[in-house]
Amino acid sequence: MTDAATNMRLKLPITCFILEIILIILFGTLVQYDYETDAKEWHNTSHQDYENDFYFRYPSFQDVHVMIFVGFGFLMTFLQRYGFGSVGFNFLIAAFSLQWATLMQGFFHGMHGGKIHIGVESMINADFCTGSVLISFGAVLGKTSPIQLLTMAIFEVTLFAVNEFILLSLLGTKDAGGSMTIHTFGAYFGLMVTRILYRPNLDKSKHRNSSVYHSDLFAMIGTVYLWMFWPSFNSAITAHGDDQHRTALNTYYSLAACTLATYGMSAITSHDGKLDMVHIQNAALAGGVAVGTAGEMMLTPFGSMIVGFMAGIISVLGFKFLSPILEDKLKIQDTCGIHNLHGMPGVLGAIVGAVTAALATTDVYGQGMADVFPAVADGSVNATKQGGIQALSLAITLGIAVLGGLIVGFVLKLPVFGTPPDTLCFEDSVYWEVPGSESPEEGELTSVKPEETEHLNS
């Protein structure tokens, strides 16, 4: 039997049931199919079935969905005793967040006649929002209870929708791949939460805050899925035609260049020239993050490769040198290193987007300017001002993420959430039935000490 403080027998079912009942009521009251999903509305107009947006967007949605549930979930399985928590809580948070995001994003973007209209594009956007929450999850991985994670998701999804509305609807910011709205927001929100939840005695669990051979292999499954599908992620909601094609291509080459930079930097920063699997699992993905904002712009293939190359270098240096400083000096215990994979590359992507937007001309974009920068095309703003809007959007995103993360962190610090003790962080058996657990004498795959077993069974 687990410790009374971490026992989820009543807390988790009550929380899950109440949240889902509320969601069902809200969906029943506010949500309905959009015209491309509704049987009556679709057949009231003259068109062919293959013109339905489903056939254009669903392949991208499938890829994004795999990234959310398989990619993010398995990327975090590197911890030797927290594989269930990584994949399992990722599953739980994502299932809740996509429903709550549908409501929050619909409230700001999709209200028609007092109803939220949903279709395949709203599914993609909900997954994007969920991705931001899962990024924040990476910062607090192994140190929080499922109740805390669900509570964090409630607040973060809401703030994500507010930030997204300000940037995309009010300011006219371009951020199709979410360098700002998804990665920067999720990273700095999560970093502030984990700062407030700082554990001065986390060293008591440091023997579990590491990987073993097979756990790193599982994490590489997540890396490979994310790497393969990132072009779909960045291009999923861009305009059909050349915009979507260009975004996928730019992401494709950015990731490739980033990967070579990652391998090179990993060897350089190691005193014996050996590769660090932490770098390969994470930094090789930074190119997808960094090209998210500018991916749909005329960045050019070599430009996207430069961005990816820079992102790989920055990310590896962050893992090697910056993460220890953040923990020692700023007391930011970032379990997955989200600052290095999502935070700094996200900021880089926002800067690249601002510069690329400021340099946009009709000679380069022609009539395509209307798709990429509609406000510039219709004369509402010039390219320089669009670049300024992009830069302002980064500042707004950072402000909302930092302030929101600090506030939510204090909420999560309340003693009602059943957090694991310092001695049992990064340990599945606190919240999960773990079959076939090995004793320390039987092998090195387990790091549970005898006194910790007594604590769990008390």
From Swiss-Prot:
InterPro entries: Ammonium/urea_transptr, NH4_transpt_AmtB-like_dom, RhesusRHD. Residues 436-458 are annotated as: Disordered. Residues 33-58, 105-121, 173-176, 238-247, 296-298, 362-391 are extracellular. Residues 449-458 have a biased composition (Basic and acidic residues). One of its GO terms (molecular function) is ammonium channel activity. The chain crosses the membrane at residues 12-32, 59-79, 84-104, 122-142, 152-172, 177-197, 217-237, 248-270, 275-295, 299-319, 341-361, 392-412. Coiled coil: none annotated. The keyword Transport applies. It is found in: Apicolateral cell membrane; Cytoplasmic vesicle membrane. Residues 1-11, 80-83, 143-151, 198-216, 271-274, 320-340, 413-458 are cytoplasmic. Gene3D superfamilies: Ammonium transporter AmtB like domains. It holds the Pfam family Ammonium_transp. Glycans are attached at residue 44. Functions as an ammonia transporter. May play a role in the elimination of ammonia in the gill. Belongs to the ammonium transporter (TC 2.A.49) family. Rh subfamily. This is Ammonium transporter Rh type B. It comes from Takifugu rubripes (Japanese pufferfish). The gene is rhbg.
